[in-house]
């Protein structure tokens, strides 16, 4: 078995500096692969998250909001595929580079991840008819 970890969510301006330490701890625990996902704020989560920030991190609220807007084109979230999980632009590139460097230093993602359906067993259950 090849353990992996997914650092999720990366909250820009709040938890992004923790990436190298998290990857080191994951590597020390045996992780061989890692990934990350930026904070996603679809639908009503924006207001909930902003209220949480105001209550628990009022001094960093504006920094987080500015970083989110830099990732998602002046919005707090963009649901576009490939953009929603990483963002785009210089700050997204900076986080991606920090992640790659931390992976290289810890030996994570050193080998390619090979996925296989070799051990999948089809349950051979026939789809039930909705209108029976």
Language model features by range: what are they?
Residues 1-6:
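Radical SAM/AdoMet-radical enzyme domain recognition
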Residues 17-132:
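Auxiliary Fe-S-binding modules of radical SAM enzymes
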Residues 8-12, 39-41:
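Active-site beta-loop-alpha junctions enriched in small/polar residues
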């Amino acid at each position: 078995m090849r353990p992996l970890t997914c650092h999720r969510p990366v909250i820009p301006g709040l938890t992004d500096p923790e990436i190298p330490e998290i990857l080191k701890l994951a590597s020390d625990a045996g992780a061989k692969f890692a990934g990350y996902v930026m904070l996603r704020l679809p639908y009503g989560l924006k207001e909930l998250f902003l209220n949480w920030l105001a209550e628990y991190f009022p001094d960093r609220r504006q920094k987080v909001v500015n970083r989110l807007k830099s990732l998602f084109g002046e919005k707090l979230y963009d649901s576009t595929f490939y953009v929603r999980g990483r963002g785009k632009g210089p700050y997204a590139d900076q986080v991606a580079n920090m992640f790659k460097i931390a992976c290289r230093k810890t030996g994570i993602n050193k080998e390619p991840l090979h996925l296989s359906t070799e051990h999948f067993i089809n349950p051979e259950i026939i789809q039930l008819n909705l209108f029976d």
